[in-house]
């Protein structure tokens, strides 16, 4: 350590050795001095070590309209779901900032249930919301959960994932978002309560009730099962937003029966303005909590998820828009990858439509688009880095449908003729 003064009696920083004239400010302590530059450096080191706590300020929470606009940049279609989520999320964080009480009125949590087919954007919506709000986010799979005391994961392990996402900052994690996927898989096998143990169905729903509503949970820091001789992380779940998602295959039949199965005549009215000639996927928008009870969720569980948002199956037009429009769309990602090798990539309209048709045929929704494009692009991504004569690669409808090689063009625009793949 440097002396705080030299032989001439000039004051110096005890850490870096700079004199009083060389710095803006020198702060005195008992027998030591520290300059403003060293204070700033120490502050940066402490912040890196401990992490900066980011309080969610009401002024910083985007309004529902703003949340919706940002969701539009990443998620195509699903307008009603985006509207419902924007309002629910805004109200949730407004509730946190108000201290959950306004003039002695207690504001209840508004956890969300997302219902829609595979690949319709449930997980992406939840991820994007967490990114917009800059809060910790964790995804859990309901199929891996079991009731306490049985082989499988305890529900508290869901909270551990959130704590890990917050770098073990519990206070930050307490304002995070947890997405529980495949929640329909924990429905009990029949509408009537079971006399036997249903450890991966009704038992899991019962175990989730407390953390959904809000409780101080004890979480094992290393995950796994609890045992008496270990320390626990205490986390209050009152302000954690839970979003549960599932495809709920078969619930449309339940809705259809409720609306009135025996309607005679094309275009007949079910009542309440609901037409009888609805297509598959269109019944979901008329879902009610009672339909979820018939599906196999217990009343207490449905009650903890008051916001119901449904997602529509994706048609060809929407899938084409998903391929091209979002900020991080698949087409833009692959164009960027090839541009790093000096090759321009183009998908013609026929190719995009054919990719969308293939995804619908596979019944994978938007989730299957990457696998299809990866299959199409594999040979090109293998060959093109070594091809200095290629300036542009065009994926055509024939490339997707008939496995024909893409069009390869030189800088002069001349086509390089390739053999069929």
Swiss-Prot record:
Single GO cellular component term: HslUV protease complex
Molecular functions (GO terms): ATP binding; ATP hydrolysis activity; ATP-dependent protein folding chaperone; protein dimerization activity; unfolded protein binding; zinc ion binding
Pfam families found in the cross-reference section: AAA_2 (PF07724), ClpB_D2-small (PF10431), zf-C4_ClpX (PF06689)
GO biological process: cell division; proteolysis involved in protein catabolic process
Superkingdom of the organism of origin: Bacteria
Subunit (UniProt): Component of the ClpX-ClpP complex. Forms a hexameric ring that, in the presence of ATP, binds to fourteen ClpP subunits assembled into a disk-like structure with a central cavity, resembling the structure of eukaryotic proteasomes.
NCBIfam families in the record: clpX, PRK05342.1
Family from the record: Belongs to the ClpX chaperone family.
Annotated protein name in UniProt: ATP-dependent Clp protease ATP-binding subunit ClpX
Lineage: Bacteria, Bacillati, Bacillota, Bacilli, Bacillales
Protein's gene: clpX
């Amino acid at each position: 350590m440097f002396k705080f003064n030299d032989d001439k009696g000039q004051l110096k920083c005890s850490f870096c050795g700079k004199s009083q004239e060389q710095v803006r400010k020198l702060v005195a302590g008992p027998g030591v001095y520290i300059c403003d530059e060293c204070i700033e450096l120490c502050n940066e080191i402490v912040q890196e070590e401990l992490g900066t706590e980011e309080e969610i300020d009401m002024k910083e929470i985007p309004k529902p309209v703003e949340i919706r606009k940002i969701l539009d940049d990443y998620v195509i279609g699903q307008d009603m779901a985006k509207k419902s989520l924007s309002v629910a999320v805004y109200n949730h964080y407004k509730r946190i900032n108000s201290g959950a009480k306004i003039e002695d009125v207690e504001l209840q949590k508004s956890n969300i249930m997302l219902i829609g087919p595979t690949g319709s954007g449930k997980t992406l919506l939840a991820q994007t919301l967490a990114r917009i709000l800059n809060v910790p986010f964790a995804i859990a799979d309901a199929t891996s959960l079991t009731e306490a005391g049985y082989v499988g994961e305890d529900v508290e392990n869901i909270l551990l994932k959130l704590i890990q996402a917050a770098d073990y900052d519990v206070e930050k994690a307490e304002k995070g978002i947890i997405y529980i996927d495949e929640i329909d898989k924990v429905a009990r096998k029949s509408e009537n309560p079971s006399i036997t143990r249903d450890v991966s169905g009704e038992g899991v729903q019962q175990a989730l009730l407390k953390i959904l509503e809000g409780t101080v949970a004890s979480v094992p820091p290393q995950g796994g099962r609890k045992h008496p001789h270990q320390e626990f992380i205490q986390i209050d779940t009152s302000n954690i937003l839970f979003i549960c998602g599932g495809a709920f295959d078969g619930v449309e039949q339940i809705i259809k029966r409720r609306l009135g199965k025996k309607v005679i005549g094309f275009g007949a009215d079910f009542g309440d303005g609901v037409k009888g000639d609805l297509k598959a996927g269109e019944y979901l928008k008329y879902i009610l909590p009672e339909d979820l009870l018939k599906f196999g969720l217990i009343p207490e569980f449905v009650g903890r998820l008051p916001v119901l948002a449904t997602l529509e199956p994706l048609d060809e037009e929407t899938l084409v828009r998903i391929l091209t429009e979002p900020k991080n769309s698949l087409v833009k990602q692959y164009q960027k990858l090839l541009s790093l090798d000096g090759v321009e990539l183009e998908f013609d309209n026929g190719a995009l439509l054919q990719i969308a048709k293939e995804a619908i045929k596979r019944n994978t929704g938007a989730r299957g688009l990457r696998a299809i494009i990866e299959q199409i692009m594999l040979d090109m991504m293998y060959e093109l880095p070594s091809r200095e004569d290629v300036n542009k690669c065009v994926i055509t409808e024939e490339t997707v449908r008939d496995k024909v090689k893409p069009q390869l063009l030189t800088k002069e625009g001349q086509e390089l003729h390739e053999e069929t793949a």
